Amino acid sequence: LGVVPSSNSEKLVDDLTPFAKALGDKLGMKVEVFTASSYIGVIEGIGSGSVDFGLVPPFSAVLSNKQSNTKNLLVGRSTSGKPGYFAEVFVRKDSDIKSIADLKGKKIAFVDPSSASGYIYAGAMLKDAGIDLEKDIQYQFSGGHDKSLQLLLNKDVDAVASYENVIRKYTKEFPTLKEDVKVIAKSELIPGVTVVASNNLDEETQKKVKQALLEIQNDKETIQILTNLFSITGFEEPNNDAYKSIEKISEKMNIDLNKVK
């Protein structure tokens, strides 16, 4: 089971291990959690078949679909009940930044070049506001949503791109986060966390994984693990048309989905 390093990799693997065990018990086989140092490392693993299936953000799903002919098995249902979530741009509450347009000349932390909420959709919002990412701002990739928040709270950057439930997710790590930051922009709906199967995983096992996940969502204790980590409360059939919005946004961001490495 491949997952992208959206937060501390070691902790992510540890937190997901009980979920992997529960899934393995349903499947009658051992399920191991795998992550890499970058989002693309997980996508490449799914493409090569060294990772059998992944629970990945939507942009990673589209990349693996395009580059490795993977199959979307299920999409996560967010805590809002929608089959997706929103990117948001955060600044410190004591900041005089009130809108995306105010970010001109500022320092921004994105998460990863392959992060939908942590870069691609937020970057598109900046472009829509007339901001040239290469000329009008200074930016860096932090490597994780938690790392971006730390940079913001430390005043190393003026703004960060993340997702709508990030404050709730990191309340333990940053107890005063809700009081310290504010949202200045919100994206259109992004397709949810997606279960993708490697092209090398046989169809019978794909069906078993899908069925096991649909059953496991009724186990409150086990699905709570995914709620805590990814803000999803269960799974549903993916609407593959919804992923076309990612292709349009990628085009706006000058990202060639066939060439991302």
Language-model regions, residue ranges each:
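Extracytoplasmic small-molecule ligand-binding "clamshell" domains
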Residues: 1-60
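An extracytoplasmic/periplasmic, membrane-proximal ligand-sensing/linker region
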Residues: 2, 7-18, 24, 190, ...
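Short coil/turn segments
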Residues: 6-9, 78-80, 92-97, 111-118
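Stable alpha-helical elements in mature extracytoplasmic
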Residues: 15, 19, 38, 42, ...
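A local structural motif
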Residues: 25-35, 50, 127-142, 178-180, ...
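Short helices/loops that flank or line small-molecule/ion binding pockets
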Residues: 40-54, 67-68, 101, 145-165
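Acidic, polar ligand-binding/catalytic clefts
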Residues: 44-102
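Pocket-lining segment of extracytoplasmic ligand-binding domains
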Residues: 95, 106-204
